[in-house]
UniProtKB/Swiss-Prot annotation:
Annotated Low complexity bias: 137-147
GO process terms (BP): translation
Xref: PROSITE patterns: RIBOSOMAL_L22 (PS00464)
Record carries keyword rRNA-binding: yes
Protein name according to UniProt: Large ribosomal subunit protein uL22
Species: Acidiphilium cryptum (strain JF-5)
């Protein structure tokens, strides 16, 4: 018996694309997926375009599909999209054998993967915004006299 399937429901500001049975091991695909997580969609597409990994082309297609779904099906602003999740899952493993010497055989496993990309509409924070936010939080922490008590002069 398998456990019941409860797909994650998407929010109104999210769109997804799913690729099934990609001919790449989940371990290798996860390296590429991790490189685009939490990035603005435009930057993620640019990174995948110039990636040297073979599977990056398929990941880019899935990301472009998610962006198109967001624009056409959910009427989201393309310039404000961020890759919120890029999930990699195991698919089938095709097993073959490789003939070896003295009548022996070695097992060859060809791994397949599933990929699910979710993009969401958010305000994209620039470096200047991030610096300003961190600068505003920093003086409050260092201004307290208790922080400097144990420091010899």
């Amino acid at each position: 018996m398998s456990k019941p399937n409860h797909p994650r429901t998407l929010a109104d500001s999210e769109a997804e694309a799913v690729l099934r049975n990609l001919r790449c091991s989940p371990r290798k695909l996860n390296v590429v997926a991790a490189s685009i997580r939490n990035k603005p969609a435009g930057k993620a597409v640019a990174d995948l375009t110039f990636s040297k990994r073979r599977i990056a082309k398929d990941v880019k297609k899935a990301l472009e599909s998610a962006i198109a779904n967001a624009e056409n099906n959910h009427q989201l602003d393309v310039d404000r999209l961020v890759v919120t999740t890029a999930d990699v899952g195991r698919s089938i493993v095709m097993r073959r054998f490789h003939a070896r010497g003295r009548g022996r055989a070695a097992r060859v496993e060809k791994w397949f993967s599933h990929l699910r990309i979710v993009v969401a509409e958010r305000d994209i924070e620039t470096k200047a915004d991030r610096r300003a936010r961190r600068a505003a939080a920093k003086p409050a922490a260092s201004a307290s006299p208790a922080a400097n008590e144990g420091v010899p002069a």
